[in-house]
Amino acid sequence: MKAIMVLFYVMMLTIIASVSMVNGSPGKDDYVNPKEQLGYDILEKLRQKP
């Protein structure tokens, strides 16, 4: 089960990275892409699980 979580985590990171590159510079903190924010929220929930 843990392996699935790790795989999912890595996939999400890859998706977020590609979305950031498509949107332009990752330094734009004033505007957050909703899809990107959703990805970060999911990652946070995964991190909080023991």
Curated annotation (Swiss-Prot):
* Signal peptide segment: 1-26
Alphabetized UniProt keyword annotations: Secreted, Signal
Answer whether the UniProt record assigns the keyword Cell membrane to this protein. no
TM ranges are: none
Tissues in which the UniProt entry reports expression: Expressed in venom sac and, to a lesser extent, in venom gland. Not expressed in brain.
Report the locations given in the UniProt record.
Secreted
- GO cellular component terms listed in the entry, alphabetical order: extracellular region
Q: Does the keyword Signal apply?
A: yes
Oligomeric state and partners? Monomer.
Q: What does this protein do?
A: Amphipathic peptide which probably adopts an alpha-helical structure. When injected in subesophageal ganglia of cockroach P.americana, a natural host for larvae of A.compressa, dampens the escape response for about 1 hour which may contribute to early stages of hypokinesia. Has no antimicrobial activity against E.coli DH5alpha or B.thuringiensis. Is not cytotoxic in vitro.
- Name of the protein in question: Ampulexin 1
Species of the source = Ampulex compressa
